[in-house]
Amino acid sequence: MTEVKNEKMNRVTVHLDEKPIYDIVMTEDFSALPGEIEKLSISNRRLCIVTDSNVEKLYLNEVKELLAPCCKTVISFVFPAGEEHKNLDTVRDLYETLILNHFDRNDMLAALGGGVVGDLCGFAAATYLRGVAFMQIPTTLLSQVDSSIGGKTGVDFDAYKNMVGAFHMPKLVFTNINTLQTLPDNQFSAGMGEVIKHGLIKDAAYYEWLLENAADIWARKPDALRKTVTWSNEIKRAVVEKDPTEEHTVAFFGR
């Protein structure tokens, strides 16, 4: 794979059966989000932004204000942050919110947050009225390079992680890499684990670049983050296109 270029806006298109399914758009702010969502013909549709209590404080108002002129109605559903809330009880509360606000099959959900938000929102979208459209607005490194891409959704059941789930492709993945500047160090490290795995397993040139630019990446310099996320998006796209349900894509270490 050739190295990706450093650009302020990058677009990666995911294909299935050689047909374009959705775009992964990466920018440095949210200003291009209205233009991207307008391409989904949402002007006469309701939109529910799903997020958690941490991301709500940082980005919900900004995103809601940007998208309000693009949609018939914009509402939000906020649940307590944490894996322990990624369960059917929270999904039930989201269903109730959608029903009370008269959401139908023509309406849309948007996941604003990390993997927990994306998994839960995607699962709700896959199952509400037998499936409604949704988009991903990932705000953590792990979700930007992995979990927001590919359509895997699900929630935990009792002590069992991701026991209840479905495959449901997003209509758009919109990444603002500047959200990584507010990410706690432990969550940034978790995302870097996936990034390094991409290089080790899929692209030696990428792994070498990661080693050479480690200081800039860990310092969260925008150019380094932009290239990291874009390169990982290209790798993830190739995996999803080859194996949409990722049934045969398994990483083996030390075996």
Residue ranges and their predicted role:
Residues 3-108:
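ATP/NTP phosphate-donor binding region
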Residues 17, 123-216:
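A glycine/threonine-rich phosphate-anchoring loop and its flanking beta-alpha core
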Residues 41-44, 68-74, 212-227, 242:
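Short, glycine- and charge-enriched coil/turn segments that flank and shape catalytic ligand pockets
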Residues 95, 193, 211, 233-237:
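Amphipathic, well-packed alpha-helical segments that form the structural scaffold of globular domains
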Residues 115:
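Acidic-aromatic/histidine active-site loop/patch
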Residues 118:
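Catalytic nucleophile loop
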Residues 217-255:
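Active-site segments that bind and position negatively charged phosphate/pyrophosphate groups
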